[in-house]
Amino acid sequence: IKDLIKHLPEWSTPRCYDRSVLTLFSRGYLVPQPYGVVLVIGTWNYPFMLTLMPLAAALSAGNVVVVKPSNVSPTCSKLISRLLREYMDPT
């Protein structure tokens, strides 16, 4: 998460690309934009980390996230569900 916070301004700024022979009279820009809706499917082997890290990355990019915790690890799934309800806006 510290790496995400550190590099987020760099990742979200528009970038200009060099011109080539084919694009001599034009400009090329890459403008990062959110995907929209992201589905994060949790795994059973590292359910907490492999659910919350993609969740943090998708939220920081401006996406709406749907989280589906693993049903193989029910205790971690309940904990993740409870924490997300407590600290996140469900709407």
Give the predicted meaning of each segment.
Residues 1-14, 24-29:
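Long amphipathic alpha-helix in the N-terminal Rossmann-like dinucleotide-binding domain
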Residues 20-91:
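Rossmann-like NAD(P) dinucleotide-binding subdomain of oxidoreductase/dehydrogenase enzymes
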